[in-house]
Amino acid sequence: MAVTGIENVLQQLQATALSAANGTPQDGVAQGTFSSELKAAIDRISDNQNHARLQAQQFEMGVPGVALNDVMLDMQKSSVSLQMGVQVRNRLVAAYQDIMNMQV
């Protein structure tokens, strides 16, 4: 089993840390509106869930090359991304309620 997935994540983290230290935006990152960024995040969560579901189905059917550890890792990634999305939604709702309760 290759560890290239971890190496890619480490490279992305290092690039993010470097660009944050330099104060420059990352290459290829477009400045979008809030709604487009929110939609993109929801799409990524959906893609993670679909990929994990597909991996699990392939493992259950006995497709060669699909290992149990990969399935479990994808399922956990999917779970964590969904939990993150729910927490972001909760924060947005709380912020909206705070704004709505402000007196004018």
Curated annotation (Swiss-Prot):
Q: Which GO terms describe its molecular function?
A: cytoskeletal motor activity; structural molecule activity
Report the domain of life of the source organism.
Bacteria
> Which UniProt keyword terms apply here?
Bacterial flagellum
UniProt-listed GO biological process terms: bacterial-type flagellum-dependent cell motility
| A GO CC term attached to the entry | bacterial-type flagellum basal body
Q: Read off the InterPro entries from this record.
A: FliE
Q: Does the keyword GTP-binding apply?
A: no
Where's it found, cell-wise? Bacterial flagellum basal body
PANTHER family named in the record = FLAGELLAR HOOK-BASAL BODY COMPLEX PROTEIN FLIE (PTHR34653:SF1), PTHR34653
Report the sequence similarity comment from the record. Belongs to the FliE family.
Q: What is the designated name of this protein?
A: Flagellar hook-basal body complex protein FliE
Q: Which organism is it from?
A: Edwardsiella ictaluri (strain 93-146)
The top of its lineage is:
Bacteria, Pseudomonadati, Pseudomonadota, Gammaproteobacteria, Enterobacterales
